[in-house]
């Protein structure tokens, strides 16, 4: 999601005629220069997914043009995907890109944080697994089975605001349902296979070229 500190936005950007962003392309507005932060895709998985999202959304050449233009607005890059939320929530910066569920959790604590889920957005599927040959395999199986119960899924929604995998468990209250989200055609296999090359290029052509 795009996250915005509403108080600073209304105080500093609204008077300039800037409208609340609705699309990925809205973040290219030069008015976001130095008030926008992001996580480094080479160190943050969530930022890589957002990077891959642009490639799937725009095609490779246009995506790199987009990322290089967006970089002109980036004050600096953080190491972790979640590291950007607090600086925006507290008003140190105005805007960023961050996981919706993590940002929503901070918003629920009373911060003036607005979440925008733009069209053609990406996603990740959280997973749990049993380690082959590990200790306590039977207990691990019991735990995995429990994770998939309605009780566990409702607990996950209530505490982490993550979307459930069960259709009989509702999405987090206050967030759109998955059916209401316009998802990009995100090819997970391609995202994995191109990751090394994309990150090398991001580091060489964007991170290494920053003043």
Positions of predicted regions on the chain:
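A ligand-binding cleft/hinge motif common to bilobed small-molecule-binding domains
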Residues: 89, 93-112
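Short secondary-structure boundary segments
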Residues: 6, 40, 100-101, 159-160
């Amino acid at each position: 999601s795009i996250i915005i500190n509403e108080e600073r936005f209304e105080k500093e950007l609204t008077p300039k005629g800037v409208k609340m962003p609705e699309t990925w392309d809205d973040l290219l507005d030069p008015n976001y220069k130095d008030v926008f932060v992001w996580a480094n895709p080479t160190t943050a998985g969530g930022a890589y997914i957002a990077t891959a999202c642009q490639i799937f959304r725009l095609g490779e050449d246009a995506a790199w043009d987009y990322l290089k233009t967006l970089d002109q607005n980036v004050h600096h890059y953080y190491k972790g995907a979640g590291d950007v939320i607090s600086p925006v929530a507290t008003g140190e910066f105005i805007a960023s890109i961050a996981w919706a569920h993590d940002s929503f959790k901070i918003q629920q604590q009373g911060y003036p944080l607005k979440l925008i889920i733009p069209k053609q957005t990406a996603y990740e599927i959280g997973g749990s697994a049993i380690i082959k040959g590990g200790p306590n395999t039977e207990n691990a199986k019991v735990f995995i089975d429990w994770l998939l119960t309605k009780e566990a899924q409702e607990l996950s929604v209530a505490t982490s605001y993550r979307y459930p995998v069960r259709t009989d468990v509702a999405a987090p209250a206050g967030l759109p349902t998955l059916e209401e989200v316009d998802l990009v055609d995100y090819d997970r296999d391609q995202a994995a296979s191109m990751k090394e090359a994309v990150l090398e290029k991001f580091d060489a052509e964007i991170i290494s070229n920053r003043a």
